[in-house]
């Protein structure tokens, strides 16, 4: 088990190597992402972290004598956690210049000294060509680097395929010998020898085919894992606007298209392509037997291609329609399950069932049209195949009768023709799958080709103090949408408690979304401690802002896991203290499992008020410098709200607090109250100042609630 010190050394070595390659890294981001406070920062975590910041790292085991040929600098990995950065080796390999991350100094070792500390493990590091956070355009060309990456393994598959095709070439020759020699001359001894040889060939063919399938499946599975991992990482890195502009079911449907690509990669299509590649050899042998019969087979190949090209656009249009209907069904299903309480309470199940039946009927009809086109395509392929077989048999019989070829040669030719046509038939039958994969790649591309949130280029970012400033901020959610915020100028000093009130739709919550950098203002600047948020790393920002919404989602984990979600390294005492401040400790203690109670999906095992208090504790446990309450207490009963209001002075201590509320009693004691109206700041002052203005919007709203 690595110590915290060794984990720190590993992380520091990563930062140094990144800086060497002109990549700036925020150490705290890496610590947070890989939880180095409580977990080891081992080889796997190191490699993943290197990949995430734009480095290409590979862990290898090399003999000491081969260190002179590796690319430097490289990380010398040691089991005791005392790693070294190997910077330079003299030409005669007599001196080794290394940097010690623990001692923060460069050291020079002789060959014998360095050989003693070297344990045979090294991490090679180079920089990637692509920019961190951005992906190359996702289409079929995305798989080319994977093919290059696994070229050695794929070369093995190609070699095995060549042997398989060679064995397939021998089989027809055996039949020819049996028909033309053994049967004619009644050569039983020759028959026995051929049979034994045939059995050996069959065994080798089975073994090699199994080996090829295993190697190929293993390689495609690795490509599948890479794509799946990249998809999920990219999905979480997308801006909030991506998810707000799409229904959940549609996004889920696009992600599920990965299954279609997975089935295609692990199916027969690619091995059929390999088999087709070796058909050239078979054609040469077939031409030797009979040029006329070979021409029949060759002329049939364009027929397969033309028919497939004719069917393709019809099939693709119907597959596209099928996907859209399936995505609509997915979205409707997710929406229905999510809103099941509302549907039950309003007794609208019959209407929902009618809508589902209508959509399902449309999807089934679309699927039937896909199957109809696919069936037509397959029947056309079979018609071509059987027509070629009849023509070959008719011509072959004429050639046998005329004495141009023997019966054995005709049988051997037909077997060879079968070996050539089989992969063509398989590919033609798999054309539907290829069209489906094309649709899947296109739909996944909608996710993977969407730009992720831009990260900061700064290396070290200071901790937030809490000064906030909005300068001439104007914002709308879309370029042709309504202006939500207009000419917002606001300065909030660190440690202030600010209340934001106003009518619904006045831009209160949008203000806090901009503060979390979910969106970038159309014009103007938002500054925290003088740092422009449009240039800041969103992870650095959000780790130091605690947010409690009106409706908060809890994960299907224990209460303690939900409270410490953003910072698993905090102690139990810190988590309990946060729960006390949030008024959650007492009810948690009364639960049978206490803090280990599983809350259920989205916290369904708890009441709304209990979920809200846990969400408040979750926001407080990280000790954020800025705390945002967006209607956070509106779902609480008066007793729970009273507990939080009593603790408000402790909650607000040494942090900037922004409270958005419709219930004006919540913000009564704030240092300042900002009144929003139609995207503008209409009023600004204390409760007493605003209430004294009888014609003010705040006084009007307060009077309505009195």
From Swiss-Prot:
Bilayer topology annotation: Multi-pass membrane protein
Peptidase C39 domain span: 1-125
Domain ABC transporter span(s) in chain numbering = 468-703
Q: Which UniProt keywords apply?
A: ATP-binding, Cell inner membrane, Cell membrane, Hydrolase, Membrane, Nucleotide-binding, Plasmid, Transmembrane, Transmembrane helix, Transport
GO BP: protein secretion by the type I secretion system; proteolysis
Task: Assign the protein's first listed, main location to one coarse class.
Answer: membrane
Q: Which residues are annotated as active site?
A: 83
Q: Which family does it belong to?
A: Belongs to the ABC transporter superfamily. Protein-1 exporter (TC 3.A.1.109) family.
Written domain comment of the UniProt record: In HlyB the peptidase C39 domain, the ATP-binding domain (NBD) and the transmembrane domain (TMD) are fused.
- Please report the name of this protein according to its UniProt entry: Alpha-hemolysin translocation ATP-binding protein HlyB
Instruction: Name the gene.
Output: hlyB
